[in-house]
Every structure is written in structure tokens, then in C-alpha cells.
């Protein structure tokens, strides 16, 4: 009976685990330029879908906006919105002007793919916001509201005619989204080159009647009393505003006044007073706070670049995260704000990590010491008294992990200052590993902050009372709502490293027809999640013509994290990623699936591989200004639309090559499971890690720039350290370039004698000394001796890299147990000497030390009993990538047959030094006990079941035997 109960409990646990896994699997990360967490197979989307169907009949048709344009922009705004079915109209507080020719759109979410004849029945509607109306035709609406055929007017007040047309643009078999577009066709005399290239855009409607615009319905230009001087276009006329400001070729706007393809940020003279311009600022206080998905924002702060990649989006029934990257920004926030931020973050992070916010020399770069965090901020201090009040967290990881993502949006309180309401955006996470600024003219926006009314503040932002709402109140309210809507969202499955590369050259001046997207790479801390890594890039151009109204040719990858330690699931949206295929020994074939004649108007876009594939030689790929991306690897595997490359150590990398006007640029990224090089996980002395691989002469450290191998300059301030096993160097003469990347005559001290603390040996790189990174353990052992490897660049602040315990039992058997900090390392003991290799996992502290290499030191700390002794040893030497590359030239294999004797038995002693060790052992024992009990239960139930079945069969036989004489008796 006990075993039966046990078995029932086991199966119940498995059922719960299965449900848990299903919930994890249902959490997807959409990587087309944003992170969208949706419980795909749970109640979340179903609930929204049912809500929309109940309220809005069979479909949800979003807004078509209709504005009256003044000569300089928004004089009087007449906006309109349409929702199909019998639903009531909602007032949409959308403050932006839609200039002539702007596009509306819709997304219809149905449970199944609709028929084509059904799609044709929907039209674009224009209604007044003040009246509740059923679905009407365009003519009905215009007649009812006496509209002069449109809401558009010329500068002289005369109306313009327009027509509408509806296009079915796309259908997503996964989300069941029917993406449709409504196009406004005007007779405003658009330039001939633009007449058939008005782009289509679509708009999402979420379940709570708030609109989230995906695409671009809004002007990116701040209008002011001084119009832009558009070459060839009369000033003070709105006739060509749309083309002038947004999609016109270069000949329609002068270089001096051409707006950049970004949302512009105002760059005031005082860096501490950074304001978002009209466009971005007004968005912060509508019911849908967002920056358009394809926008980049760049502001010049006295020569310091601030790069805003697609930013934070929060709609209260969907979690959408976008990221802020800042490089060399200068801020000077008040002490009150810094202190408050520290309090809030410490409270909400709920981790053991000490969060320290520093403000040195006006460089606001708060860090968490010892952990790979960076925090940046855009802030305005006009409402300092409200800083403590209304903070909205759009994403927050509450997890005791070494990596997290925090994105906060702060809305200043209206009562503090009714003329200044600015969004505060924070991002915490690994700093971007590379930021390339798009070489477009950065232009200072002109405009004044809007006078925002209380009705425009998001409902969940805490209202407009400076004294009544705390940050905690708002955060708890928001998180409570999110957890109610989608309780299975594991918030910490957000990327913790966001690498944004704003590509150069591609469609730079065509932001609407050709959307220049950023290459975004996501790395998720996978120690507790999966063995794979989400990777995505979003590099697209949108070609618009009569035949194909809207095509985004590169949507990247849509990835989903599986449950537990399962494999990463990847759904490929299309096949337009560039492929690289190895052909022979000396050439690589680069195949780019790029549509023909895309973004080639006016020669703005470099030629792409449209028709004929080109084969590049290694020399071409390795040309100056290129990134080395080929002969570092043993082989190239083409899997679907990307490349998995395996190096000599079994570590997989992702290779992404982009064709630029002059070269092939390749990005290499390693998967998180390769943060520990694969060969380190083998057994010392085996084929995986031969003893010869651990000789001091064979160990070194090479630098890889955030996973991006470079053959050019080395900037240690932003490079990470990774351990790489080099080829077998036997003498110092084999290392001609060992110090190529180090400063000439750099002096490093080492002391390998524990007994003579004052003895030092200096050497220079010119000496080409062997890489003898060793700890001398020949003098003095106790039964339990511990060694700790540390490095320092000033001789006082030491960072522990690894710790090893050498246990020697009474018979002289040595057992080596090594534990590593987050940098990791490996120790091997032989002839009384420890050889070590260490590497850093993107650690700020280590990287900072290597910024100044004038006096880098490494030391071995020997600890036993109650005393310790320290030996300063030679620090890590440097070797150039070029030398490393040469070492990888394949050699003719030598085939030998050897007979090896079995290795002597080794006694392993488990060392328990901490509660963590004890918990780990306890967990292992518990798992073993679980398996034993499980199989005992299965065995018992099996035996019991067999007995029951046999007993039942026996009973049947007995009954048959008893019945037989009776039948015979009555038959006589």
C-alpha cells in the first residue's frame, strides 16, 4: 500500500512537472526587433482573442488616423478611429500629426485562416470620435459627418480628395494574424518617384482597448515655427510635408536640413536636462507608451553619443521589452535621484548582490561591483520632487541570478511641473559589446515640450499626485496585473545581454521605404534554462510597390525556450539570412537571399548579391577592415538559415556575414554553453585533455572582442578574456608575436618562491619568456592545502580567479579539487607545480584591470592551518590573434599505433567546505534516493500487479472448473 501511494505521488509529480514544462514552452521570445513574452499555448492570447471577439465581433480593426494639417504641422488635429462590429468607439489620445499620405492599418486575429472572399468585405472606415456608430461604409461616414471627402486640407484651406484601398498584406499561420493595410491615396501631387511607393503600415489593438502601433504611423520630425528648407519644395506649404520629411529621396530635401532616420532627441546645453522632443515626449503620456519599432534615436551630448535602440514598450496586457544602449554618455543626476534609485533597485532585485550606484566625474554609470551589470539612464531633473513617486517598471527580473534585466520608465508627476513631463528610461544588463553608429547626420530637434494634460497619463502610472504614490505601489500594481494576465510568464527569461549593431550603409536615407534595422543579439543566462542560446538579428528593408505592397525580407529568428534543460526551439520566419558555405580549402561561397532591386533607388544602397552568387577567397574575406571569420574553425555547418561553426575544442559559434560596399563583415558569437571551453570539461590525461596540453609553455590567453574576432587594434577596456588552448609551443622562440598586442617593454613581476617573499624577477616582452604561469607547491604541504590564484593591477586589490585544494592522504595519494569563481580556470599538478589557465566570463572587474597593463600581477596564495603564504607569479602573457591563427594551420596527421597500460587507480576525496557544497551533496544523495525509491515502487507495483492478475486468472479458472460439473450434471 505504501508503495502504491508512493507511486501515485511520483506520477502526480511528473504530471505537475509536465504542466510546468508546458508553461515554459509556451513562453516565446519574438526576436523581430523586440522581446514579446506571450503565453502562446496558455490563457493569455486566448483571453485577449476571446475578449476581442466578444467585444468586437469577429475581428478587431484598428485606427485609421485623419488629421487636419497646418502649414507647419499640427495646428488643429482632427483624428478618427474605427473599430468594427458594434463595439463602442474609444477616444484615442494620439497626439502626433499624420501628414498627407500617411497610412493606417489593421491586424485581425482570428482562430482560423479566413477565406479570401471574407477578407474582401472589410473596408477602411473614418468616423468621428464623439459618436458611437456601427460599421459604415466610407461614403456613409463622409455623408453623416459632412466631411469634404477627407479631413485633409491644403494650406489655403481648400480640401483634398482622397480614396482608400484595403490590402491583405500577410497572414501568420502561427499567431493567426491577418495583417491588412489601409492606404490613403491623395492628389497632392506627390513626386513621380514616390507616387506608387507609399508604404503600408499596420497597427495592433490590444485587449484593453489601448493601441500599440507597430510600424510607423507617426512623424519622426519635431515641427516648429520654422519649417525645414526642403530643396525644391516651397516653404510654408504642407503639400509635400510627408515626402519632404519622411520618404523623399535626397533631391527633395537639402543635406543641411535633412532629418535623420531617427526620432530626434533635443540636446540642450545642460546635459542634466535631457528632454525628449515632441514626438517621443507625447508618446510617453498617451495610453500606449512606445517608440516605433524601427526607429533609432541618436542625440549628440557635447560630443558624447547616446544610442537608443528600440526602447521600452509597456502595454498592460502585453509585456514588450526594448533596449537602451548608451556609450560614453555624460549625465549629472542629483544625489536624491541616485539614492532613491539605489533603494528601489535594491528592494526589487531581491538578490544577494550589493547594488552600488556611483557618480564619478559626472559620468553616470552605476555598476554592481563584481557582476556584469551596467546601468544607464536618460533623465530630466525638472521635477526632482516627483522622482520618488511615479516609477513604472516595464520589466524586472526577480531572480537570484548573476544576470538580470531591468527596464524602468519614469513619468514625472504633473503637479510638480505642468510644462515639463519627461520619460525616465533605465536599462540594466551587460553593457553592449559593440555599438556602430549609423553614419547619418545627427540633427538637433527643434520644439518645445508639450503641455500634457492629466488625461494623457497612463492609468497605471499612479495618477498625478506628487505625494500620494510611491514607486513600490506602482510596481506592485503593475506586476500584480501582469501576473494576473499571464501568471506563467517567467520574467527572468529575458535577454540579459543585448548587443545592438546599427548597421552602416544599408538604406540609411530611406527610413520609411527601407527600414534600416539593427542587428540585435540576445544572450540569456542559460544555467538554469536551456543548453541553447536565442540569437536574432533584425536586418530588413521594406520594398513597397504595386505588386508587393509590403514585404519585410528579413525578420530574423523567432525563438522559444524549452523547459528545463531542453534544447532551444527555433522557428525561422524566413530564409533570408546570409549563408556561408565552405567550398574546398581556399574559398568560401557567400549566399545572400536578398530580393532583387531592393532599395536601389538613387544609388543610396550598395549593390547586394541579388542574382549571381559570388565565391570569396580567404584572402578576400580577410581583407583590411574585415573581421576574420573563416580559418579560425575546423568546419562550417550550414543549419537552416544560419551557420554553426565548431572550433578545435568542440565549441560552437555563430557566424553572421554581411555584405558591405567594400568587403564582407562577419560577426562571430559564441553560445553561452561555450563560456567554458569544451575541452576543459574532459578528464585530465585523456584524449580530451592530454597532459601535454597543460604544460606551462602551451597555455596563454587570447582576447576576443565580445565574441567578435578582430585582427586589428586591441582596446582592452571593452574586450573580454577567454582561455584558448594554443598549439604546442616547445620553446620561447616559437612565440615571435607573444607580446605583439602588449605595450613594448611592459614589465611584469613574478615571485615563485614562497620562502623568499622579497625576491622578484622582472622581464620584458622582448625576452620571449615561456608562458610559465605556475604555482610552486614543492615546498611544504599539509594534509589539506589550499591554493588560490589571484590577479591585480596595482598590487593591492586582488581578484580571486580560482581556488584549488590539494589533499594528500597518509599514503601520499594526491587528490586535486578546484573551484572557480565566475571567471573559471583549470589547475593541473605535476612535478610539484600547478599550471593554470584562466578565463573571464565578461567580467567588468577583470576587464577593468586589463585596461591598464602597466603592472598586472598574478599570485598564488597558499593556505593551510591558520596561516597563509603568498607567492607573486608571472602574470598572463598576451598573444596576438594573428599568431594564434597561424598556429591553427592544419598539419599532416601522423598515425601511430600505441598500446597503453591502464591508468593506476585514483582515490577521489569529496571536499565539503561550505553550505553550498553540503547542499549539493545532499541534493545528489536525494536524487539517488529518489531513483531508488522510484524503481522500488515500480518493481513492487509490478510484482503486486502480476500477483493480482495471476490471482484473477486463477479465480476464473477455478470458476470454470466449478461450473463444469454443474453443466454436465444438468445435461445428463
Curated annotation (Swiss-Prot):
Query: Does this entry carry the keyword Transmembrane?
Result: yes
Please indicate the ranges of residues that lie on the Extracellular side: 22-932
Work out whether the entry's keyword set contains Glycoprotein. Answer: no
Report keywords, A-Z. Host membrane, Membrane, Signal, Transmembrane, Transmembrane helix
Enumerate the Cytoplasmic topological stretches: 954-972
Q: What is this entry's stated membrane topology?
A: Single-pass type I membrane protein
Q: Where is the signal peptide?
A: 1-21
Q: Where is this region: Disordered?
A: 892-912
Q: Name one GO cellular component term.
A: membrane
Membrane-spanning residues: 933-953
Q: Where in the cell is it found?
A: Host membrane
Q: What is this protein called?
A: Uncharacterized protein ORF41
Q: Which organism is it from?
A: Ostreid herpesvirus 1 (isolate France)
Amino acid at each position: 500500500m505504501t508503495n502504491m501511494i508512493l507511486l501515485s505521488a511520483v506520477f502526480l509529480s511528473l504530471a505537475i512537472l509536465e504542466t510546468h514544462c508546458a508553461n515554459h514552452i509556451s513562453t516565446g521570445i519574438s526576436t523581430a526587433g523586440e522581446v514579446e513574452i506571450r503565453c502562446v499555448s496558455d490563457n493569455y492570447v486566448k483571453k485577449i482573442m476571446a475578449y476581442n471577439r466578444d467585444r468586437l465581433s469577429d475581428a478587431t480593426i484598428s485606427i485609421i488616423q485623419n488629421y487636419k494639417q497646418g502649414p507647419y504641422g499640427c495646428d488643429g488635429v482632427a483624428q478618427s478611429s474605427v473599430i468594427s462590429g458594434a463595439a463602442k468607439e474609444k477616444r484615442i489620445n494620439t497626439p502626433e500629426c499624420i501628414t498627407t499620405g500617411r497610412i493606417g492599418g489593421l491586424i485581425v486575429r482570428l482562430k482560423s485562416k479566413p477565406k479570401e472572399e471574407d477578407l474582401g468585405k472589410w473596408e477602411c472606415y473614418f468616423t468621428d470620435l464623439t459618436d458611437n456608430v456601427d460599421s459604415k461604409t466610407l461614403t456613409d461616414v463622409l455623408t453623416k459627418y459632412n466631411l469634404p471627402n477627407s479631413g485633409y486640407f491644403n494650406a489655403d484651406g481648400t480640401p483634398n480628395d482622397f480614396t482608400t484601398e484595403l490590402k491583405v498584406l500577410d497572414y501568420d499561420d502561427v499567431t493567426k494574424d491577418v495583417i491588412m493595410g489601409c492606404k490613403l491615396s491623395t492628389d497632392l501631387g506627390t513626386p513621380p518617384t514616390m507616387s506608387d511607393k507609399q508604404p503600408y503600415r499596420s497597427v495592433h489593438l490590444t485587449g484593453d482597448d489601448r493601441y500599440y502601433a507597430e510600424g510607423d504611423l507617426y512623424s519622426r520630425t519635431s515641427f516648429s515655427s520654422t519649417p525645414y528648407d526642403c530643396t525644391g519644395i516651397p516653404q510654408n506649404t504642407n503639400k509635400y510635408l510627408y515626402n519632404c520629411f519622411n520618404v523623399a529621396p535626397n533631391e527633395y530635401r537639402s543635406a543641411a536640413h535633412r532629418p535623420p532616420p531617427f526620432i530626434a532627441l533635443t540636446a540642450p546645453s545642460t546635459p542634466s536636462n535631457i528632454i525628449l522632443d515632441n514626438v517621443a515626449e507625447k508618446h510617453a503620456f498617451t495610453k500606449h507608451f512606445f517608440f516605433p519599432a524601427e526607429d533609432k534615436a541618436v542625440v549628440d551630448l557635447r560630443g558624447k553619443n547616446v544610442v537608443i535602440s528600440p526602447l521600452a514598450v509597456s502595454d498592460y496586457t502585453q509585456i514588450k521589452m526594448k533596449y537602451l544602449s548608451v556609450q560614453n554618455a555624460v549625465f549629472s543626476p542629483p544625489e536624491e535621484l541616485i539614492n532613491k534609485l539605489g533603494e528601489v533597485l535594491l528592494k526589487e532585485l531581491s538578490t544577494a548582490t550589493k547594488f552600488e550606484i556611483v557618480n564619478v566625474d559626472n559620468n553616470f554609470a552605476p555598476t554592481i561591483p563584481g557582476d556584469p551589470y551596467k546601468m544607464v539612464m536618460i533623465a530630466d531633473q525638472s521635477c526632482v520632487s516627483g522622482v520618488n513617486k511615479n516609477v513604472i517598471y516595464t520589466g524586472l527580473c526577480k531572480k537570484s541570478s548573476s544576470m538580470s534585466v531591468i527596464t524602468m520608465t519614469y513619468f514625472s508627476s504633473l503637479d510638480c511641473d505642468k510644462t515639463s513631463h519627461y520619460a525616465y528610461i533605465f536599462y540594466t544588463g551587460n553593457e553592449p559589446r559593440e555599438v556602430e553608429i549609423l553614419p547619418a547626420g545627427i540633427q538637433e530637434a527643434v520644439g518645445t515640450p508639450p503641455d500634457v494634460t492629466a488625461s494623457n497619463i497612463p492609468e497605471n502610472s499612479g495618477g498625478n499626485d506628487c505625494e500620494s504614490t510611491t514607486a513600490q505601489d506602482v510596481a506592485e500594481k503593475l506586476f500584480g496585473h501582469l501576473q494576473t494576465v499571464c501568471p506563467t510568464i517567467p520574467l527572468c527569461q529575458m535577454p540579459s545581454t543585448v548587443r545592438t549593431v546599427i548597421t552602416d550603409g544599408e538604406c540609411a536615407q530611406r527610413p520609411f521605404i527601407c527600414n534600416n534595422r539593427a542587428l540585435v543579439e540576445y544572450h540569456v543566462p542559460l544555467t538554469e534554462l536551456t543548453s541553447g542560446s536565442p540569437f536574432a538579428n533584425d536586418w530588413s528593408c521594406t520594398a513597397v510597390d504595386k505588386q508587393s505592397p509590403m514585404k519585410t525580407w528579413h525578420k530574423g529568428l523567432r525563438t522559444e525556450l524549452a523547459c528545463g534543460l531542453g534544447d532551444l526551439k527555433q522557428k525561422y520566419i524566413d530564409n533570408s539570412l546570409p549563408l556561408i558555405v565552405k567550398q574546398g580549402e581556399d574559398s568560401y561561397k557567400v549566399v545572400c537571399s536578398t530580393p532583387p532591386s531592393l532599395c536601389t533607388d538613387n544609388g543610396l544602397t550598395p549593390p547586394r548579391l541579388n542574382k549571381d552568387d559570388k565565391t570569396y577567397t580567404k584572402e578576400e574575406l580577410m581583407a583590411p577592415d574585415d573581421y576574420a571569420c573563416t580559418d579560425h574553425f575546423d568546419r562550417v555547418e550550414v543549419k537552416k538559415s544560419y551557420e554553426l561553426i565548431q572550433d578545435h575544442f568542440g565549441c560552437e559559434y555563430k557566424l553572421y556575414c554581411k555584405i558591405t560596399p567594400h568587403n564582407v563583415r562577419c560577426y562571430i558569437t559564441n553560445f553561452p554553453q561555450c563560456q567554458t571551453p569544451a575541452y576543459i570539461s574532459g578528464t585530465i590525461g585523456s584524449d580530451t585533455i592530454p597532459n601535454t596540453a597543460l604544460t606551462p609553455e602551451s597555455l596563454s590567453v587570447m582576447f576576443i572582442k565580445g565574441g567578435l574576432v578582430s585582427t586589428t587594434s586591441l582596446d582592452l577596456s571593452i574586450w573580454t578574456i577567454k582561455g584558448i588552448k594554443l598549439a604546442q609551443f616547445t620553446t620561447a622562440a616559437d612565440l615571435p608575436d607573444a607580446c605583439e598586442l602588449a605595450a613594448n617593454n611592459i614589465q611584469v613581476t613574478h615571485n615563485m618562491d614562497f620562502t623568499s617573499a622579497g625576491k622578484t624577477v622582472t622581464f620584458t616582452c622582448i625576452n620571449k619568456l615561456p608562458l610559465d604561469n605556475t604555482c610552486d607547491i614543492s615546498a611544504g604541504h599539509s594534509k589539506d592545502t589550499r591554493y588560490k590564484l589571484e590577479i591585480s593591477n596595482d598590487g593591492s586589490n586582488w581578484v580571486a580567479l580560482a581556488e584549488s585544494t590539494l589533499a594528500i592522504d597518509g599514503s601520499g595519494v594526491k587528490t586535486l579539487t578546484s573551484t572557480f569563481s565566475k571567471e573559471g580556470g583549470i589547475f593541473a599538478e605535476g612535478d610539484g607545480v600547478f599550471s593554470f589557465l584562466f578565463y573571464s566570463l565578461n567580467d567588468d572587474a577583470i576587464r577593468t584591470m586589463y585596461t591598464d597593463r602597466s603592472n598586472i600581477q598574478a599570485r598564488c596564495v597558499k593556505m593551510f592551518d591558520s596561516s597563509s603564504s603568498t607567492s607573486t607569479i608571472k602574470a598572463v602573457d598576451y598573444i596576438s590573434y594573428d599568431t594564434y591563427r597561424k598556429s591553427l594551420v592544419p598539419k599532416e596527421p601522423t598515425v601511430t599505433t600505441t598500446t597503453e597500460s591502464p591508468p593506476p587507480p585514483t582515490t577521489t576525496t569529496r571536499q565539503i567546505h561550505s553550505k553550498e557544497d553540503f547542499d549539493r551533496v545532499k541534493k545528489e544523495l536525494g536524487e539517488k534516493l529518489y531513483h531508488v525509491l522510484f524503481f522500488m515502487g515500480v518493481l513492487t507495483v509490478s510484482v503486486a500487479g502480476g500477483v493480482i492478475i495471476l490471482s484473477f486468472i486463477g479465480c476464473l479458472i477455478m470458476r470454470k472448473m466449478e461450473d463444469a460439473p454443474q453443466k454436465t450434471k444438468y445435461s445428463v
